[in-house]
UniProtKB/Swiss-Prot annotation:
<dbReference type="Pfam" id="PF02696">
    <property type="entry name" value="SelO"/>
</dbReference>
<feature type="binding site">
    <location>
        <position position="184"/>
    </location>
    <ligand>
        <name>ATP</name>
    </ligand>
</feature>
<feature type="binding site">
    <location>
        <position position="266"/>
    </location>
    <ligand>
        <name>Mg(2+)</name>
    </ligand>
</feature>
<keyword id="KW-0808">Transferase</keyword>
<protein>
    <recommendedName>
        <fullName>Protein nucleotidyltransferase YdiU</fullName>
        <ecNumber>2.7.7.-</ecNumber>
        <ecNumber>2.7.7.108</ecNumber>
    </recommendedName>
</protein>
<feature type="binding site">
    <location>
        <position position="95"/>
    </location>
    <ligand>
        <name>ATP</name>
    </ligand>
</feature>
<keyword id="KW-0067">ATP-binding</keyword>
<keyword id="KW-0547">Nucleotide-binding</keyword>
<comment type="function">
    <text>Nucleotidyltransferase involved in the post-translational modification of proteins. It can catalyze the addition of adenosine monophosphate (AMP) or uridine monophosphate (UMP) to a protein, resulting in modifications known as AMPylation and UMPylation.</text>
</comment>
<dbReference type="InterPro" id="IPR003846">
    <property type="entry name" value="SelO"/>
</dbReference>
<keyword id="KW-0548">Nucleotidyltransferase</keyword>
<feature type="active site" description="Proton acceptor">
    <location>
        <position position="256"/>
    </location>
</feature>
<keyword id="KW-0460">Magnesium</keyword>
<dbReference type="GO" id="GO:0005524">
    <property type="term" value="F:ATP binding"/>
</dbReference>
<feature type="binding site">
    <location>
        <position position="177"/>
    </location>
    <ligand>
        <name>ATP</name>
    </ligand>
</feature>
<feature type="binding site">
    <location>
        <position position="266"/>
    </location>
    <ligand>
        <name>ATP</name>
    </ligand>
</feature>
<keyword id="KW-0464">Manganese</keyword>
Length: 490
């Protein structure tokens, strides 16, 4: 594979070719005395960028907002949305600057600086991102990719001593993040709320032609738009099944944080569950628990209805739109059962397996069992070592009775225990980005030390593989981790 220097990348800038009502062209506001804290060679390969370029002064200048991407077209996009279930009106990229779109071996990727200064859409914000939240986003996007879950990616993390005020004084940072597109549900809501059918159609055509060309083959009047909604609904359903299956909580599933491509987008107050609780809320700011773990699939459907309502300006037949969205629950349930069945070591999901899963989750809830390690221990039990699994439960007799039910189910499945256990280890991760692991990386980064970021990325790229010397990263959280909380402050 031929890798390029920064000024030789192939750029497309398709979003910038839309009418200028979709964005504002502007220059980034550079960080003072920026330093490259970490760069991601794996992400660089996607756009054909030579990893050596990541450590050049030219790249630092681009990643810190000092100069535009060669051949790029820097802009901030406008969108609207519902936040915590309430219409928030116009929003937009309040601190993100889209540098351009690069075509490389891994497809087309938009490059965006998050934390690069004020835009016309900043509202009450300062246009900056703090080091704390930037480290979390940088790590989380790569952790999700390692888990096989659709996500934006992270290319680089640049830091500065520039002060930023949140609850306390912090320092500024910029994440260079990558996505095939940053178009959101809220991008459609924006034009729908203005009853601007012309621009709504332009946006729909852009998304269809760029990302869902198969929708053009749909039959019937407005078939392409209905097919678009169906594709987005299907991808969203599968994304929710992915999240639920690894105990991931997004924390702020507003419609402006929902990707039109079904990607995990905008890592803020997210969290991977430690002690399992059905109604676990990872965002300290979510006082009503709207975005609790067990509500995420239904919130996603609520958000899809907001998207469907926006498309009503293009599809007058509301029943047709509702008919598409009526498919979501079946899509999600099938995807969720497939993932959870694999985690339980089942080749095919049967109707009785619903009770088996529900009973396990209830036992885990009652014991506050660790989500990741409890599921991981199931493969050990299949290999004949049941005690590690049972030790996660307060009521071990009930856990033993449950295990006996699963073992009986396995006996009807026909696979050898070793094959079954190996398959379970491939879908039950050993390493996830727990809050305390991210916090340790943040504390080191605040001292200019990126070694913990580097260590975590190495582990999280292979989350299903046992890695020697990494026992501490696969252990229960230390007691001090109970005091950690995350919020919308970033």
């Amino acid at each position: 594979m031929m890798l390029s220097k920064l000024d030789a990348l192939t750029l497309d800038n398709s979003f910038a070719a839309l009418p200028d009502t979709f964005y504002t062209r502007l220059a980034a506001q550079p960080l003072g005395r920026p330093r490259l804290l970490h760069a991601n060679a794996e992400a660089a390969a996607l756009i054909g960028l030579d990893p050596a370029e990541l450590h050049t002064q030219a790249f630092l200048e681009v990643a810190s907002g000092q100069r535009p991407l060669p051949g790029g077209d820097t802009l901030a996009a406008v969108y609207s949305g519902h936040q915590f279930g309430v219409w928030a009106g116009q929003l937009g990229d309040g601190r993100a600057h889209l540098l351009g779109e690069v075509r490389g071996p891994g497809g087309s990727w938009e490059l965006q600086l998050k934390g690069a200064g004020l835009t016309p859409y900043s509202r009450m914000g300062d246009g900056r991102a703090v080091l704390r939240s930037s480290v979390r986003e940088y790590l989380a996007s790569e952790a999700m990719h390692g888990l096989g879950i659709p996500t934006t990616r992270a290319l680089a993390l640049v830091v500065s001593d520039d002060p930023v005020m949140r609850e306390t004084r912090e320092t500024a940072a910029i994440v260079t993040r990558m996505s095939p597109s940053f178009v959101r549900f809220g991008s459609f809501e924006h034009w729908s709320s203005r009853r601007d059918g012309e621009r709504l159609r332009i946006l729909a055509d852009y998304v269809i032609d760029r990302f869902y060309p198969q929708c053009r083959e749909a039959n019937g009047e407005h078939g392409d738009v209905l097919a678009l909604l169906r594709e987005v609904s299907q991808r969203t359903a599968h994304l929710m099944a992915d999240w639920q299956s690894v105990g991931f909580c997004h924390g702020v599933m507003n419609t402006d944080n929902m990707s039109i491509l079904g990607l995990t987008l905008d890592y803020g107050p997210f969290g991977f569950m430690d002690a399992f609780q059905l109604g676990h809320v990872c965002n300290h700011s979510d006082s009503e628990g709207r975005y609790a773990w067990n509500r995420q699939p239904s919130v996603a459907l609520w958000n899809l209805y907001r998207l469907g309502g926006s498309l009503h300006g293009l599809v007058p037949d509301a029943d047709a739109l509702r008919g598409v969205l009526a498919e979501y629950e079946t899509l999600f349930t099938q995807a969720f059962h497939a993932r959870m069945g694999a985690k339980l070591g089942l080749s095919v999901w049967q109707s009785d397996d619903e009770a088996l899963l529900d009973d396990l989750l209830r036992l885990m809830h009652d014991s506050r069992a660790d989500f990741t390690l409890t599921f991981r221990a199931l493969a050990q039990a299949v290999r004949g070592q049941t005690q590690p699994f049972l030790d996660y439960f307060i009521d071990r007799e009930a856990a033993q009775a449950w295990w006996s039910r699963l073992a009986a189910r396995h006996a009807c499945d026909g696979r050898a225990a070793a094959v079954r256990a190996e398959g379970m280890d491939r879908v039950n991760p050993l390493y996830v980005l727990r809050n305390h692991l991210a916090e340790q990386a943040i504390r080191a980064a605040q001292q200019g030390d990126a070694s913990e970021i580097d260590r975590l990325l190495g582990l999280l790229r292979r989350p299903y593989d046992l890695q020697p010397g990494a026992e501490a990263y696969a252990a229960l959280p230390p007691d001090w981790a109970a005091g950690l909380s995350v919020s919308c402050s970033s």
